[in-house]
UniProtKB/Swiss-Prot annotation:
<dbReference type="GO" id="GO:0005524">
    <property type="term" value="F:ATP binding"/>
</dbReference>
<keyword id="KW-0436">Ligase</keyword>
<dbReference type="GO" id="GO:0006400">
    <property type="term" value="P:tRNA modification"/>
</dbReference>
<keyword id="KW-0934">Plastid</keyword>
<dbReference type="InterPro" id="IPR012795">
    <property type="entry name" value="tRNA_Ile_lys_synt_N"/>
</dbReference>
<comment type="function">
    <text>Ligates lysine onto the cytidine present at position 34 of the AUA codon-specific tRNA(Ile) that contains the anticodon CAU, in an ATP-dependent manner. Cytidine is converted to lysidine, thus changing the amino acid specificity of the tRNA from methionine to isoleucine.</text>
</comment>
<keyword id="KW-0067">ATP-binding</keyword>
<keyword id="KW-0150">Chloroplast</keyword>
<dbReference type="GO" id="GO:0009507">
    <property type="term" value="C:chloroplast"/>
</dbReference>
<dbReference type="InterPro" id="IPR014729">
    <property type="entry name" value="Rossmann-like_a/b/a_fold"/>
</dbReference>
<dbReference type="Pfam" id="PF01171">
    <property type="entry name" value="ATP_bind_3"/>
</dbReference>
<dbReference type="InterPro" id="IPR011063">
    <property type="entry name" value="TilS/TtcA_N"/>
</dbReference>
<keyword id="KW-0819">tRNA processing</keyword>
<comment type="similarity">
    <text>Belongs to the tRNA(Ile)-lysidine synthase family.</text>
</comment>
<protein>
    <recommendedName>
        <fullName>tRNA(Ile)-lysidine synthase, chloroplastic</fullName>
        <ecNumber>6.3.4.19</ecNumber>
    </recommendedName>
</protein>
<feature type="binding site">
    <location>
        <begin position="35"/>
        <end position="40"/>
    </location>
    <ligand>
        <name>ATP</name>
    </ligand>
</feature>
<keyword id="KW-0547">Nucleotide-binding</keyword>
């Protein structure tokens, strides 16, 4: 294989796949399974470039199996994901223990994908399986004595219907409703109004570019770390969270969140029948002027109590809940309230080593301590990009857009953005055709609908435009009398029942996984990543030849390539032939006498 590769040609090849030609990807949310390796990094880069043209939304998920004590793989994945302005999810294995064997790790991984997809409303999950992975799976199953089903195991798209959400992800976390914050001061500082706060079953998070927050429960707090004033009034004590924020405008601020059960200093009264609790924020600029911002948050029949905790992870500080004094009905001045708080750093010490002072490294240490102390089964953390860095928002007169991406990737993004106008013009023409067809159906009446359906093949029925489905279903519902036509064929009855069924809830829809790179070899992806200078982490465990898959990848496949350099493509084509026969005839059982072998 030559060292030159046309990266745009490879991206266009992906764009010709069934996922794009059937227009399934338009206005969808895609979750990419990211491991930090070569295949998943190329997959993320390709779809990030194509998202600028097609307009779909991306997210990435990284699962930490804790197979090694070194956090290097997680750190490299975190550094790579920071380059892209997309939300990404970090999943820690239960109790931070190694997830073994391989089948158990796979089940846990796919169950995590399904859980996140269900929470965050993702339509598809994309994995980075390549043609080389398909070949290795075929050889692996052949060596184990598999039948037709094992040879054609890796498909371009696959449905999982028996997966269940991992309840242990959110058993011990506070569940908040969305949206979480309601800004009451519209004339307040624009920095806080630019924050977006997100809800999930496991974590509530505020996310600038490199900062995040997480709420949880059942965390013991050492009261000795939080000195209290006026202990005689301890009955009226309330919790107050305290942390520092570095404004991306270059202004340092000190923020205070007061969790109060009753009327706070803002004067906002709690309405009957609601679960809103007042929160106070005090901000201090460099010039020592203060301006309060009043916020409300809505809970789901829960209150923040002594067992709850708030984490804030940043490049400088991470502070726990602190106790603050507030007497009932007493008006406490802002400066006096600020002076009462003595925050204590609780989970890291600054070290000279760069990896030790890294934000994500400290986060990993904290998660392990929490799980060892509180026996939390598993943790999911959501990282979202700071809203000011999205689009063409001007900060200090400069545009922040794809700032950390390599130049080669930016160049391909600009090319795809130019194709965006042509794409939407063509799609609008298709929509107009769909509208014309549906209008003709409605004008000619219901009797012509069976003819229109029956002219389509049974296989192409599922590829019908969604707009037509909506129009047909509306037409069926308009018929108040017996909607089933007389002398209808059995084929039409099946289609009719399928159309007349109510739309199923999204929670019960099958979990769909796509493998867009299944027709591309690992060598081609290696050239693609080199040309675009994509950062890749090479896992040392892949060199262990005691693992069967590594032995096939490192020893057997290179030997077969010496016989025929295109052996991977031939094995892949062979598996597709077997897959075709399996779909037509099913899993054929061979007579036992065909397997008679002489054993000396």
């Amino acid at each position: 294989m030559t060292n030159k590769l046309d990266c745009l040609k490879l991206i266009n090849f992906i764009e010709k796949s069934n996922l794009f030609t059937t227009n399934k990807i338009r206005d969808k949310k895609l979750l990419i399974a990211f491991s930090g390796g070569q295949d998943s990094s190329c997959l993320l880069t390709i779809f990030y470039i194509l998202s600028k043209k097609w307009g779909f939304k991306l997210g990435a998920v990284y699962c930490n199996h804790c197979w090694t004590d070194s956090p290097q793989s997680s750190l490299s994945a975190f550094d790579t994901l920071q380059m892209f302005d997309i939300p990404f999810y970090f999943v820690e294995s239960p109790n931070s223990e190694p997830m073994k064997p391989e089948q158990k790790a796979r089940d846990w991984r796919y169950s995590s994908f399904y859980t996140i997809s269900k929470w965050e409303d993702y339509d598809f999950v994309l994995t980075g399986h390549s043609l080389s992975d398909c070949v290795e799976t075929v050889l692996f199953n052949l060596f184990r004595g598999s039948g037709l089903k094992g040879i054609c195991s890796l498909k371009e798209d696959q449905k999982f219907s028996n997966l269940k959400t991992n309840d242990f992800f959110f058993q011990k976390t506070v569940c908040f409703l969305d949206p979480f914050f309601y800004f009451s001061d519209k004339k307040g500082n624009p920095f806080f109004r630019k924050y977006r706060l997100f809800q999930s079953m496991s974590f509530l998070s505020i996310f600038p570019k490199f900062d995040f927050f997480a709420f949880g429960e059942n965390c013991a707090i050492d009261k000795s770390n939080f000195p209290l004033k006026n202990k005689s009034k301890g009955k009226n004590l309330q919790f107050l969270t305290s942390f520092d924020i570095k404004n991306w405008f270059g202004i340092k601020k000190i923020c205070r969140f007061c969790f109060l059960d009753k009327i706070g200093q803002t004067g906002i009264k709690k309405k009957r029948g609601t679960n809103r609790v007042p929160i106070l924020i005090f901000s201090r600029r460099v010039n020592k002027t203060t301006s309060p911002l009043a916020l409300n948050f809505q809970t789901k029949n829960k209150r923040v109590d002594r067992k709850s905790f708030l984490f804030r992870f940043s490049l400088a500080f991470a502070l726990p809940l602190a106790f603050a004094l507030r007497a009932k009905g007493e008006k406490v001045r802002k400066n006096a309230l600020l002076n009462q708080i003595k925050p204590v750093s609780f989970f890291f010490k600054t070290k000279k080593d760069k990896t030790e002072t890294n934000l994500f490294h400290r986060y990993l240490q904290t998660i392990k301590k929490l799980q060892n102390r509180d026996k939390i089964s598993s943790f999911i953390t959501i990282f979202r990009p700071f809203i000011l860095t999205l689009g063409n928002v001007k900060i200090k007169g400069k545009k922040i857009k794809n700032k950390n991406l390599p130049f080669q990737i930016k160049k391909l993004i600009r090319k795809k953005e130019k194709e965006k106008g042509i794409l939407w013009n063509s799609l609008s023409k298709l929509d107009n055709k769909d509208k014309l067809i549906s209008n003709q159906i409605q004008k000619k009446g219901f009797k012509l609908i069976p003819k229109f359906i029956l002219t389509k093949d049974k296989k192409s029925f599922s590829n019908f435009p969604p707009f037509i489905f909506d129009q047909l279903e509306k037409t069926f519902r308009k018929e108040k009398v017996d909607t089933k036509p007389r002398n209808s064929s059995p084929q039409f009855e099946v289609l009719f029942n399928k159309l007349s069924q109510p739309s199923s809830d999204k929670k019960n829809v099958d979990f769909i996984v796509f493998r867009p790179l299944i027709k591309i070899t690992r060598e081609t992806l290696f050239l693609f990543s080199n040309n675009l200078k994509i950062p890749i982490y090479y896992d040392k465990s892949n060199k262990d030849l005691n693992i069967t898959r590594n032995y096939i990848r490192k020893v057997l496949v290179p030997l077969l390539k010496k016989i025929n350099p295109r052996v991977e493509e031939n094995i892949y084509k062979f598996s597709k032939i077997i897959e075709f026969y399996y779909q037509v005839f099913g899993d054929l059982k061979c007579p036992s006498d065909r397997f008679d072998i002489f054993n000396p």
